């Protein structure tokens, strides 16, 4: 069986996702699709618009065969750890032949070339990177500058203004990290990319003439009404959203504020909250009236909006250093969120070919620390979204789509 893996958030599932899924099937000529999807918290460091089971239903309606959960620890981390968690999970299933992801550039050879340099870390590249970090540049920017300088030094024939754009575009960054993880794992999975069409990943405005970003759809749902987003998502996705509730970002801010005020030392447990940003957050927590306001008061050249969002999310989820250290390792279980008949066949192949622990229903006995963290994340999410109850992870079985 020729199986393709895709890495998604579906927050929410829209027309761009539908196109990516269709094209992924075509370009890889696959027999089935496994989707690794973020759970109730996503890579921007925010609660998902709607819960992971509703989004699983969207994926299955769209034609995904098997949906598995990306553990929350990876799902709420930077591109490097997000990609490693997802790719290593797909790799450990021992049934995935291809991985297909979107990118702004659509050039798999360039993406592979850049990821190879990063993995091999030639000495000159490392020196350039060290120099840019000393200048105070945030790591992603320092790395992109070091890559360009290294390629220039090696007389690599390219348009460097184009290359700069490639290295600083959200989906390209993730694409490079996916390939980097494949190299590190010495995986036999073959990477494919599809050029992203329509609005920019970070574009927050809906436009009738193009495929909208998930950011724009979420903003529309939060600020006006769901009807405005109908033209930008499949009908099945819209119908599922129409009949569910959404996470409340104001409640998230209240919980983050409570966590910081009641225990200011919580920031010392998060390695990302260093270089004085911990003090800046504590100083501004009383001045801000919303999550957005707090982040804007604290952000700087080194600490971007999204990076701060992830720090605040880790405060909310009470992440500690011991837990964060687990991001270096591949998950040793796979949590099944849903499947169709073909997905059931793929599960049989996984059982036959892989030693990974397959989790269908949760037991209240002691489990893997990553899985325990997922359960805690869902319980915290239940304070933000009324459609989810405490202990939903124990109560809700994988969705079977017929």
Swiss-Prot record:
Family indicated by similarity: Belongs to the TmcAL family.
Protein name: tRNA(Met) cytidine acetate ligase
Residues where ATP binds: 7-20, 102, 171, 196
An individual GO BP term: tRNA modification
Pfam family, one: HIGH_NTase1
Organism, as annotated: Clostridium perfringens (strain SM101 / Type A)
Source organism, top-level taxon: Bacteria
Gene that this polypeptide is encoded by: tmcAL
Recorded GO CC terms: cytoplasm
EC number(s) stated in the UniProt entry for this protein: 6.3.4.-
